C-alpha cells in the first residue's frame, strides 16, 4: 500500500544504519548490454559469489525477468537455495541501491519502504540512459513482494547511493550529487535537506562537497564515505597531490573534521586509500558493450570511479571490492580493523566497476524487525 498523506518522521519511523541487523538483501541480475560487458556474461560469475556470501547469512531477493530467469537459476544451481528468492520484477538495469526502496523502521516491529523518483542519475539533463520507467516502478513492486507498505515521496528524485545514515539521526550526502541540475533543480538546498529529514526520520544532514573523481552518478556519497558505527567513519583517500581525487577528499575531510553528528559527537575518521593505479576501461572492454541510442557510452582509457569504500555490510560480513591493485590488501587490513566483529570477504570487482558502480551500489538492505 502506498502512503501519500504522511511521512516517516511524522509516524515515528527512521532509516536504520546498514550495520544494523538485516532481514535480507535485494539484488538484480545484470544483463543490460550498455552497462555490462558481453551483456553481463563477465560480471555474472561475480554475482554468483556475491549471492553465495549474502544468502549464507540473510535472505537474498533476486530480481530477474522471466527471459533471464533460466540463466540465473542455472548459474546459481550449485548454491543452497533455501534463502534465495526469485522476484519476477522487470528493471532497466541492475542497481538495486539506487532504484530500490529505502527502508525505515519504527522500533516497534514495523517496517516500511520509501518510493523516491528515479531518473537514471539525471534525467534529460545528464542521465545515463533515456528509458528508465521500469527502474522507477521497481521500488513499489519490491515492497509489495515482501508485504511492506511504502511512503510516496512524490516527485522528489533520490538514489539510495546518495545517502548514508548512522541510525541515530545523522544523514551524510554530497553537494555534487544532491544539488545537481538533473535531480531536483527547482528545490533549494534547504528544501532538499527538509525532505531528507522528514523521510529518513533524521535530525541533521552533513553535506560533503564532493565524491569520487569521474563518478557518473554526480558523485554519490556511498563511493567516498561510509559509517563504521555512530561517530566513526571511513573516507576515501589519496596522498598523491597530483591525483584529481586529492582535492576532492581533502575538501570532504575538512568538513568532517569540523562537523559533529546529530548527537554532538566529533567523528573518528579512518582514511581508506583508493587504488594505487587508476582503474580504466580497456579497449577490449569498450568494444564489448552494446549501447542504445541516447545511452551514455564508455570510451577506452576512461578512468572509472573505483573505490574500496563501496563495500557492503551484510550480517556478519564486509563484502569488499578488489581491483587487482597493490592497495587491495591494505583495504582488507583497514576494514578488518574497523569491523573486528565481521568477516572481510574480498571479491573481484573490475567487472562490476566497468558497469559504473560496485557492491554497495548493487545491493539494498532490508532491515530486520521484531514482528
UniProtKB/Swiss-Prot annotation:
UniProt-listed InterPro entries: Agmatine_deiminase, Peptidyl-Arg-deiminase_porph
Catalytic activity entry: agmatine + H2O = N-carbamoylputrescine + NH4(+)
Record keywords, A-Z: Hydrolase
A GO MF term: agmatine deiminase activity
UniProt keyword annotation of Hydrolase present: yes
Pfam families, per the entry: PAD_porph (PF04371)
Active site per UniProt: 361
GO biological process: putrescine biosynthetic process
EC number: 3.5.3.12
NCBIfam families reported for this sequence: agmatine_aguA, PRK13551.1
Protein name (Swiss-Prot/TrEMBL): Putative agmatine deiminase
Organism field: Selenomonas ruminantium
Gene (UniProt): aguA
Amino acid at each position: 500500500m502506498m502512503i501519500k498523506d504522511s511521512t516517516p518522521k511524522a509516524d515515528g519511523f527512521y532509516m536504520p544504519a546498514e550495520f544494523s541487523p538485516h532481514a535480507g538483501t535485494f539484488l538484480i541480475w545484470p544483463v543490460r548490454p550498455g552497462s555490462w560487458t558481453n551483456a553481463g556474461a563477465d560480471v555474472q560469475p561475480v554475482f554468483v559469489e556475491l549471492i553465495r556470501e549474502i544468502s549464507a547469512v540473510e535472505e537474498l531477493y533476486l530480481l530477474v525477468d522471466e527471459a533471464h530467469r533460466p540463466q540465473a537459476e542455472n548459474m546459481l544451481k550449485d548454491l543452497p537455495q533455501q534463502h534465495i528468492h526469485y522476484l519476477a520484477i522487470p528493471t532497466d538495469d541492475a542497481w538495486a541501491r539506487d532504484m530500490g526502496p529505502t527502508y525505515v523502521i519504527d522500533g516497534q516491529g514495523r517496517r516500511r519502504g520509501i518510493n523516491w523518483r528515479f531518473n537514471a542519475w539525471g534525467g534529460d539533463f545528464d542521465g545515463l540512459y533515456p528509458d528508465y520507467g521500469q527502474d522507477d516502478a521497481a521500488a513499489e513492486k519490491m515492497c509489495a513482494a515482501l508485504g511492506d507498505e511504502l511512503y510516496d515521496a512524490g516527485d522528489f528524485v533520490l538514489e539510495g547511493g546518495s545517502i548514508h545514515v548512522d541510525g541515530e539521526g545523522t544523514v551524510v550526502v554530497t553537494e555534487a550529487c544532491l544539488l545537481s541540475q538533473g535531480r531536483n533543480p527547482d528545490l533549494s538546498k534547504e528544501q532538499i535537506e527538509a525532505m531528507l529529514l522528514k523521510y529518513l526520520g533524521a535530525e541533521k544532514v552533513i553535506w560533503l562537497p564532493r565524491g569520487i573523481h569521474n563518478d557518473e552518478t554526480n558523485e554519490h556519497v556511498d563511493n567516498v564515505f561510509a559509517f563504521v558505527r555512530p561517530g566513526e567513519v571511513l573516507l576515501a583517500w589519496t596522498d598523491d597531490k597530483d591525483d584529481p581525487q586529492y582535492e576532492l577528499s581533502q575538501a570532504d575531510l575538512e568538513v568532517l573534521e569540523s562537523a559533529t553528528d546529530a548527537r554532538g559527537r566529533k567523528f573518528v575518521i579512518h582514511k581508506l586509500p583508493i587504488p594505487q593505479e587508476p582503474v580504466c576501461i580497456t579497449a577490449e572492454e569498450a568494444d564489448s558493450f552494446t549501447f542504445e541510442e541516447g545511452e551514455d557510452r564508455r570510451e577506452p582509457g576512461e578512468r572509472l570511479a573505483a573505490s574500496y569504500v563501496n563495500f557492503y555490510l551484510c550480517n556478519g560480513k564486509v563484502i569488499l571490492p578488489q581491483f587487482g591493485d597493490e592497495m587491495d590488501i591494505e583495504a582488507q587490513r583497514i576494514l578488518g580493523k574497523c569491523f573486528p566483529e565481521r568477516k572481510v570477504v574480498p571479491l573481484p570487482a573490475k567487472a562490476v566497476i566497468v558497469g559504473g558502480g560496485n557492491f554497495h551500489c548493487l545491493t539494498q538492505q532490508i532491515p530486520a524487525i521484531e514482528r
